[in-house]
Amino acid sequence: MESHWVEPESLSTHEKVQEIMTLILGRKRGMTQLFDADGTVHGVTVVEVGPCVVTQVRTQEKDGYDAIQLGWGDIADKRLAKPQLGQYKKAGLAPKRFMREERLSVAATCKVGDTVTCDIFKEGDLVDVVGTMKGRGFAGTIKRHNFHRGPETHGCMNVRQPGSLASKRIGKVIKGKRLGGHYGDTRETSKNLRVVRVDAARNLLYIKGSVAGANNGFIQVRTAKTGVRQKAKA
């Protein structure tokens, strides 16, 4: 998502990065409840994000596109490939476990080593959260595709079977038929979730609703590409 931000002269380098950045990396901590001033309870996901480090700045002249590469999470040198380790040594940065890129039209205003913290988002902002769904191994059609089971009485013997696969005339199973198989362990995006609270001191975001993945799983939080920002309650 491109930013149409115009650089003001009064902002510091960190503030400039915070203004243009639309992505931050972190991990899921779990779920809890928060109460509004009127007593309304909200189920929220607690996400620990940042501080992330700008590990590389891509420009139109050198790379053919404008983007910022972020790194998050410490990792031992021996667990990185030599090309990755060389990139960090050249930049003078500590190795990071996760790296992701975000395309920005004003990426050239950032430099390697700049930090991105959770206060790039404010209360009421809409975000898209990307995580890896929990792996559930082999699952049948009821759990995997929400099929209804068959009757359990009057001698019925196909309670959880998938049912007919195709007609006799076709003589084969059509590609794409929903059947049992591996379920989970896939990339999932939860869109247009509202930021309920920002705890900059502890690098925490409280996001309304559920987020894909297990606790301590790696996630990405970015500005929502669709949806309209909701108005704050008076």
Task: Annotate each PLM feature.
Residues 5-234:
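Extended basic (Lys/Arg/His-rich) segments that typically form rRNA-contacting surfaces
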